[in-house]
């Protein structure tokens, strides 16, 4: 029984992290240049920390890209930074505090860490003098996007989310526990993130993330942000990969039911990393929705 339980978790882990192994690299500080077709990077002081971001494009429509667990703008959104329309959009891909290049501080996971990320994200974009923004949120970044849209409705124009969930189930908890020990990950899954963070930081942060996300299971109905969904006012596109082994379809259906006026787009061959595996299709979908 133990073997049967561990194997699916390991498979899910590989599916989660495998898209990063060919794209992830250690972020390098890049010179700030004229915003346009060249991706630039910088840091800005927000809420007592220095948040790192990448920026590209010169369009009127500002878009913030929000990465997933242990992710960063550079590792999670390369195809979007490269290929989304630079004349129509200005793209900003951020590293949440404690992730990527937004260190120090080390990442921690108090119960309100998603709310903290949402405030950081909005305040970052305000510090960059954007009057209003749209959100692209993957996985944990999708949860952060939902909270930001609910709490700052006048600031968010539109939102695209995928791989997100508003609550935690027993099934989710089993998946989380299966990835706690990074020494049990495959080398292909571990090495790229180890190059980004170093082994000790990666191992500790992964354990802390599992504890942080698992604490929601102790709340009524496993609540992360389900109580905030009725407050979302912006047009919302939910994208779900029908072969996603990490986030079951019922999470997308729940969001569709509780986010007023939202739309659900299913990708039959999509998995958790659908925006990387099917980048061209995903980018077209995003551009059509945000126009």
UniProtKB/Swiss-Prot annotation:
UniProt-recorded Gene Ontology molecular function terms: alpha-amino-acid esterase activity; serine hydrolase activity
UniProt note: phenotype after gene disruption: No obvious phenotype is observed for Bphl knockout mice. Valacyclovir is rapidly and efficiently hydrolyzed to acyclovir in vivo in the absence of Bphl.
UniProt keyword terms in alphabetical order: Acetylation, Hydrolase, Magnesium, Metal-binding, Mitochondrion, Signal
Residue numbers bearing the N6-acetyllysine modification: 74, 86, 119, 126, 191, 217, 243, 260, 271
Post-translational modification N6-succinyllysine, affected residues: 74, 126, 184, 191, 260, 271
GO aspect biological process, one term: homocysteine metabolic process
Gene3D superfamilies assigned: alpha/beta hydrolase (3.40.50.1820)
Family annotation (InterPro entries): AB_hydrolase_1, AB_hydrolase_fold
Keyword Magnesium: yes
Span of the signal peptide: 1-37
Site (Binding of alpha-amino group of substrate): 140
Free-text function comment from the UniProt entry: Specific alpha-amino acid ester serine hydrolase that prefers small, hydrophobic, and aromatic side chains and does not have a stringent requirement for the leaving group other than preferring a primary alcohol. Has homocysteine-thiolactonase activity (in vitro) and may play a significant role in the detoxification of homocysteine thiolactone in vivo. Catalyzes the hydrolytic activation of amino acid ester prodrugs of nucleoside analogs such as valacyclovir and valganciclovir, converting them into their active forms (acyclovir and ganciclovir).
Name of the protein this chain belongs to: Serine hydrolase BPHL
Species of origin: Mus musculus
